[in-house]
């Protein structure tokens, strides 16, 4: 799973430098709206909505925005109707890419995704072409400064911990079954252990290590996809060596 830890590190640094709050809020509003539409507006009985609200609050979204998004999802307020569509394909160096979207215009979205993939050195594939390479998991990052690896493992084993990654210098990455993400969050909260980026993630079974040129192209493509208004999340099985990471960080 070392590739996952490195990719998490890259994404964290990217988010710190180029996150656009307006774009982030748009994606969070869509997720809250869809979650409320699918599972109802009460977060206590809707784990997806509860996670979406927690993520929105962690990113300083005002409660008024959250409540309006919930009401649009439940039909109490008028608003756009979003459809969830997942696209699959390949990127530079042969990496697999999964693109999750939420859109009110399927034709616009597929044209945009196809254009971005083609321009970025990738190509769209058929449904299922790369999805089989990934497993959906719960993922949480816990600062190393907050707890030791042994104590964290002991704390979370009964709550649903599946794997604890410790390759990152600053964070442990906790992986769980999707249904166990909420119990693991609760265990951390009750123990007073801080955590970040609790989310549902797509974890690849294997990784493709890229050289500098392909890694640069892949990051540029993923960045372009993530900046599309209709894209909610992008997953890949890219990996890179420490030396490649160092080169890219200096650019």
Curated annotation (Swiss-Prot):
Kindly list the GO molecular function terms attached to this UniProt entry: DNA binding
Q: Could you tell me the Gene Ontology terms of the biological process aspect for this record?
A: regulation of DNA-templated transcription
Report the main location listed first in the record: cytoplasm
Respond yes or no to whether keyword Cytoplasm is given for this record: yes
- Subcellular localization: Cytoplasm
* Stored InterPro entries: Integrase-like_N (IPR017856), TACO1_YebC-like_2nd/3rd_dom (IPR048300), TACO1_YebC_N (IPR049083), Transcrip_reg_TACO1-like (IPR002876), Transcrip_reg_TACO1-like_dom3 (IPR026564), YebC-like (IPR029072)
- Give the top-rank taxon of the lineage listed in the UniProt record for this protein: Bacteria
What are the UniProt keywords, alphabetically? Cytoplasm, DNA-binding, Transcription, Transcription regulation
Record keyword Cytoplasm present: yes
Q: Can you quote a single GO CC term?
A: cytosol
Under HAMAP family, the record lists: Transcrip_reg_TACO1 (MF_00693)
For this chain, the family text in UniProt reads:
Belongs to the TACO1 family.
- What name has this protein been given in UniProt? Probable transcriptional regulatory protein CT1665
UniProt source species: Chlorobaculum tepidum (strain ATCC 49652 / DSM 12025 / NBRC 103806 / TLS)
> From which lineage does this chain's organism come?
Bacteria, Pseudomonadati, Chlorobiota, Chlorobiia, Chlorobiales
